[in-house]
Design a protein with these regions (language model features):
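Beta-rich nucleic-acid/ligand-interaction surfaces
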Residues: 259-267, 345-351
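Coil-to-beta-strand transition motifs
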Residues: 215-217, 249, 264-266, 279, ...
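Catalytic or ion-translocation cores adjacent to nucleophile or general acid/base/metal-coordination motifs
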Residues: 235, 244-264, 273-334
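Active-site microenvironments that recognize anionic phosphate/pyrophosphate groups
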Residues: 1-229, 303-305, 319-320, 329-405, ...
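Helical scaffold of the NTase/Pol beta-like nucleotidyltransferase catalytic core
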Residues: 193-197, 227-252
């Protein structure tokens, strides 16, 4: 069984093109060394289907049985990455192949790289497949919802081991270029099967890679070669468009650079993009304006729950100039009546979540206006999911959510399943610790439906979760989608 699965793993590498046929013996010997095995017996695997997840499971069980690793998801993930490293081409080979294909066409290069990132098990397809995904109609278009299940939950043993592990500042964070080839440790994932594409944006060295958790098609991360903090400035817009010019089929956006309205990693300058059209990109402009000195740029308010200005034009340099002008104006903008304060007690509040894309021959720059002010009533943020929705979403509204994709916590999968049972069988929701937090939310929609049945209950819950996410996005909008809110928005635009 052991030798059979070693052979299957090598065959998988050949079948996917990770290794050539001429490296069969070499790769076999590398895998044997990882197991401390001196012997090898050839077996016949012809006609057998090779499923990577199954092959790795057998080999991981063998590693546990041999006492090489502890039987926990953290150690298993570290070890199977070590196994996959035996099948990986060197970074230089991957970069050369990418460059060769890029000469033909950028799409061919990214297709090759995206497939490699999955075949290598850096993107664990079998975990990503577990994510729950659905769409919901909203007043702003079709919203995407996903419950992320591909990030493994750490077990108590690994958490305890991580506390005892000696501190290491290498790599400095999960986005540093030093992750490429890193063996990992109990509190840092292994990245031996990871390959980074070096690119140049704004005349500086950056890296291009895919997210291991792919929230949407070809979800990529573009990060600074230096460990330097997030900062939204004019140079940000230059970098975004430099990337879009390299890969015109991809959009690229940045999280905001302030807490509450920013992403989870503010310590390392990075962007996220991909080959996907979000609801926000499809949303039309509800009204257009002319900005003095920028008459050649189309500017409009996007029909979207967050406060978004869209700039359109054939010359990206003009969008960059106008984007910088709007950013500067917004950073210093206060309108007490609209409850917008540029700063309180010296702490700045206004920033922007920008997204760049190319549509045909036209460049677009979407600027979502953000503000992170807090009050006693809303201690986590006035323009942040309000407390009544925290049963569904209380995390920051980052770039991905801004564009119309809800990334919801894994706990919701089980909670929705329990809720479904309670609704169908008319049980008391507040009697169950796991779902009592949803009781008042359920009462807001219970009366809208004649009956909850096993056939309709899950689609009802999915729809209602989508409605909550739309409300959450409205909470994050600085200028509301009301006549009054639109007047406040136009008041800001007039200052430009």
């Amino acid at each position: 069984m052991f030798f059979e699965n070693i052979k299957k793993l090598v065959q998988y590498g050949i079948d996917t093109g990770l290794i050539p046929e001429c490296e069969r013996i070499y790769t076999t010997n590398m895998l044997l060394e990882v197991f401390g095995e001196d012997n090898y017996e050839d077996t016949d695997i012809s006609g057998q289907e090779i499923v990577l997840e199954d092959v790795l499971k057998v080999l991981l069980d063998e590693a546990v049985a041999r006492g090489i690793i502890e039987d926990s998801i953290v150690y298993r993930d570290l070890f199977d990455t070590k196994l996959m490293n035996c099948l990986m081409p060197r970074p230089g080979q991957v970069q050369a192949e990418f460059a060769k294909r890029y000469e033909v066409c950028p799409t061919e290069a990214t297709d090759y790289y995206y497939k490699l990132s999955q075949d290598s098990d850096y993107i664990r397809r079998y975990r990503v497949k577990k994510d729950r995904k659905w769409t919901v109609d909203s007043p702003y278009g079709v919203i995407d919802i996903t419950i992320n299940l591909s990030k493994p939950e750490k077990d108590p043993k690994a958490i305890a081991a991580a506390k005892l592990a000696k501190a290491s500042s290498y790599p400095k964070c999960l986005l540093c270029v030093e992750n490429e080839g890193y063996a990992g440790r109990v509190n840092h994932p292994a990245r031996q099967n990871h390959r980074i594409m070096p690119i140049t944006v704004n005349d500086s060295a950056w890296g291009f890679q895919y997210s291991p958790y792919v929230y949407y098609n070809e979800h990529c991360i573009v990060f600074n070669g230096e460990h330097t903090p997030m900062k939204i400035e004019k140079a940000t817009f230059i970098k975004l468009f430099d990337f879009v010019k390299l890969f015109p089929h991809y959009f690229l956006g940045s999280n905001a650079d302030l807490p509450i309205v920013g992403g989870s990693i503010l310590s390392h300058d990075h962007f996220q993009g991909g080959h996907y059209t979000f609801a926000m990109a499809k949303a039309p402009m509800e009204e257009t304006f002319e900005i003095k000195g920028f008459e050649d740029v189309e500017v409009g308010i996007v029909n979207w729950p967050l406060s978004v200005l869209r700039l359109r034009g054939k010359d990206s340099d003009r969008l960059i100039e106008l984007g910088a002008h709007i950013l500067d104006a917004w950073r210093g903008y206060t309108d007490a009546e609209a409850f917008v304060f540029a700063e309180t007690d010296g702490e700045p509040h206004n920033t922007i979540t920008p997204i760049a894309r190319k549509v045909g021959e036209i460049y677009e720059l979407d600027l979502a206006l953000r503000n992170n002010i807090t009050t006693e009533e809303h201690p986590l943020g006035v323009y942040h999911p309000h407390a009544q929705w925290h049963n569904i979403k209380k995390e920051n509204i980052g770039l991905i959510e801004v564009m119309g994709l809800a990334v919801l916590p894994a706990r919701l999968k089980e909670e929705m399943e329990i809720l479904a049972d309670y609704l169908v069988n008319d049980k008391d929701i507040s009697s169950n610790d796991k779902i009592e937090k949803h009781a008042s939310w359920v009462e807001t929609f219970r009366g809208n439906y004649e009956a909850f049945t096993e056939e309709n209950v899950m689609s009802i819950l999915e729809k209602e979760v989508g409605i909550v996410f739309t409300r959450v996005l409205e909470d994050a909008g600085v200028f509301k989608c009301t006549p009054e809110g639109r007047e406040y928005f136009k008041r800001f635009i007039k200052t430009l």
